[in-house]
C-alpha cells in the first residue's frame, strides 16, 4: 500500500460531490468501479496505468506547469487544473508516482506563435468555394440520413457501402468522415446504435441560406475544439495546434483531422493562410459571414420546368426551395445549375410525407419560370389519384387491417412473395396481419403499393419512418451512486481508518511491522511484530524479540511501519493514529 495515497484520500473525502464527479470523468473512471472507500479511490488514481492515461490528455500549458512542479518550481496559474485532476497535491507538489511518470517523458516546451498570414484574394476565393461546396455536401449528407439512417462501423466511421452510395451524389468519399464529424458537432446528425441519423434541428438548418448554414457549422466547430486549442472564446493560431498535446501519441492524427475540417469549412486556405472571415472566430467573436458571402454565388428562387419531366435551376437554388423540391423530385446533377427529375415514385414519396396534388402544383407554379408542363401536371394528378388506394389501419381487435376498393390489388398483395413476412390473411373485408400497423405500411410502400395509414376517424396520417432524435450532448456518467458509497465508508477519524487499512495490508502480506504501543501508564513501547491476523479490534502476530504470540488492541497502536517487506508481498507503507 502506498503512503502517497493517504493525502489524496483525505483531499478526496473533503471535496464536493460535483468536483469529485468532474475528476472521475476527466480521469476516465468507470461509474461502476468497485471502490469501497476514498483510500481505494486515491490508490487507483495514483496507479501508474491511471497516470499514464491522464498525462496525454494534458494540453501544452498544463504539461509545462506539471513538469515545472516535478522539477521543484512553482506550477503557476495552471496548478489549479492539475490539482483538480489529482496530478498535483493541494500544496502544488506532485506525488512520487506522478513525478516518476512525468520524468520519464520528454520535456514539453511552450513558445509564442504569431497569427497566421492573411489570405490573398486568390487563396480566399478558393477557401470560399470550398466552404460553399462543404455546406452543400453536408446538406446532401443530412438529407440522405433523414431518409435512411447511415450505417457506421464499430470505430464510428461510415461503412464503405454508405460511402459508395453517398459518393454517387458527387461528394468526394475521402471527405465523408470529416463531413459527418462536422455535422455531429453541429448537432445535425447523431450516432445511435451504430447508425447516423438526422436530428430535430437538421430540418431548420437545411432551410437556412448558405451563409447562415455556414455560420452554424463554424460556431459549432469552434465550440467542439479540444480545450488545448482554445484561447478564451476563440482558438489558438492554427500553426500552434500541432504542439498542443505534447504527451499524446494520438494527437498528430487527431490534429490533422481537425485541421482538415477547418480547411473544409474555409477557415484555413490551402497555403495555410487565414481568410478574412476566420479572424472573428479565432478571436472569440461571433461569426461574420459578410466577407464570405461576397464570394459565394448568388442563390436563385426560380426554376425551368420542362416537358421531359425535368427541372433546371439556373444557379444555386435557395436552400428552402431546394429541400422541398427534392422531396418531390430526384436531383440528377448538382453544380452551379442543378437538374431534377420528377417520377411517379418521387411524387408518391412526397404524397406520403404529407404533400397533396394541390400543394405540389401550387409550389411548382410559384417557382417556375415556364409554367407547369402538361406531362408534369398529368403525372402529379394521376399519382395522387392512385395514392391511398390501399388503406392500412388498426381494427377494434388490435390487428392490422389492409383495405382497398380494388379487389384485384388485394389479391395481388395476398400472393406477393415480397410480402410473405407480413403473413397477410384474406377475409371478406380485405387483408389482416399480426404485424404492427407501421411495419405493414412501410413494407407495402417499399413494394410500391399505393398505401396510406388512416386513423380511427378514417383520415390519412403522416408517419415519419425515421423520427429525428432531439439533439442533446452525450450523457455524462452518473457518479452519484459511487460517491455516495465512498462517503458511507468515510469515518470521522481518517488517521484511524488509514491505520486499519495499513494493518490489513500487513496481515495480507505477512509483513514485519514496527508497532508503537501506548501503554496504560501513558508511556510508549515499540514491538517488532510479524502480523498474522486482524479482527475484533485486535492485531495478532509473533513478537520477534520475545518469540511469543501477542494480541494487541488496535486502539492502543499509535503507529505501525513495515520494516521487513521482504517477509511478505513487499508492502512499504506506514500508518499512524
Predicted regions and their residues:
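Extended alpha-helical interface modules used as scaffolds for assembling large macromolecular complexes
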Residues: 214-529, 533-538, 545-548, 559-577
